[in-house]
UniProtKB/Swiss-Prot annotation:
It holds the Pfam family DUF508. Residues 71-82 have a biased composition (Basic and acidic residues). This is Uncharacterized protein C38C10.3. Signal peptide: none annotated.
């Protein structure tokens, strides 16, 4: 291996990359060029040492290289970084103000970064006050009788629905329910939960050949949605099956899965009740509604 070393004064002889140094106090440099030849080819290694003061004899340079070489070998083994301890071979006294391209790993770099675990949301954050109300039912007409369809402006209907829902009494229910509905644009601040109820809507009707048929619709509604609004929403979906018939059905419902034997008839007072009031529980998950508009229960126009 051939090696040459040359001392320079000034920054004119520095490589272009080192000329970008803004500190003009480094006016002394030592350039060492190593040439190593093997069967694979020739390897050229360049080492430049900068200093603010004149460098001493070449022996001091060789001593500095001897001190930093173990550090360079340690840096080539990333697995041993955590086992490195401060020793004589790492701490190099820079009494002459030398700056080298070879640097040892600092203690801060050897520390492992700990990832902060994401904070999991608790159930207390799922209160109604923090839930954004859905607008998917805002266009539903709000009427007192299910047989009459509203043609009013949706904006006016929303205002009327908010007014009527806020004045609804809770005396018919043993449990205290919130005074707002899913149509409200704001919350009352009460710490109550609103669950989504899976509603199955079974329509019994007659086809064009006057044969008895049935159609099934499924949707989800908040537990504080009134039964009347649920029926009106489904009525808009089943207009094709009704043809030109008046919608004067016989209604019945059952909590949970669809069961004809366990179904209960719907009275006029039940139409103004919410799904939670109808099931007498806030934890209602499924409701089935049977709507019979067959020939015995319908009136042709």
């Amino acid at each position: 291996m051939d090696s040459t070393m040359t001392n320079y004064m000034g920054q004119e002889n520095l490589p272009p990359a080192l000329k970008l140094i803004n500190d003009k106090s480094y006016q002394y440099s030592t350039h060492k060029h190593n040439i190593e030849t093997s069967n694979d080819g020739t390897l050229h290694s360049y080492t430049i040492v900068l200093s603010r003061e004149p460098l001493e004899s070449p022996t001091s340079y060789n001593k500095y290289q001897k001190n930093v070489e173990p550090v360079q070998k340690e840096n080539q083994k990333p697995k041993d970084l955590n086992k490195m301890t401060a020793g004589p071979h790492i701490a190099v006294k820079n009494s002459s103000g030398l700056v080298s391209q070879i640097s040892s790993t600092t203690s801060s770099e050897r520390k492992r970064r700990t990832l902060a675990r994401p904070s999991s949301s608790s159930e207390s954050d799922l209160k109604v006050g923090n839930i954004q109300q859905s607008n998917q039912y805002f266009t539903l007409p709000s009427v007192m009788k299910p047989s009459a369809l509203s043609t009013e402006d949706p904006k006016k209907v929303i205002v009327q629905s908010n007014t009527s829902s806020s004045s609804m009494s809770d005396a018919s229910s043993k449990k205290s329910l919130p005074t707002y509905t899913y149509l409200s644009g704001h919350t009352t601040g009460s710490a109550r939960y609103v669950t989504m109820v899976n509603v199955k809507f079974l329509l019994l009707h007659c086809d064009v050949l006057q044969r008895r048929a049935q159609s099934m619709f499924t949707d989800e509604f908040p537990s504080d949605c009134r039964l009347e609004e649920v029926v009106i929403n489904f009525h808009q979906l089943c207009c094709r099956q009704l043809l030109d018939q008046n919608f004067n059905p016989r209604l019945s419902y059952c909590i949970g899965e669809l069961n004809y034997s366990d179904s209960k008839p719907v009275s006029a007072n039940d139409m103004s009740k919410t799904l939670a009031q109808l099931a007498t529980t806030q934890s209602i998950a499924q409701l089935s509604i049977i709507v019979d508009v067959t020939e015995k229960n319908m009136k042709l126009k």
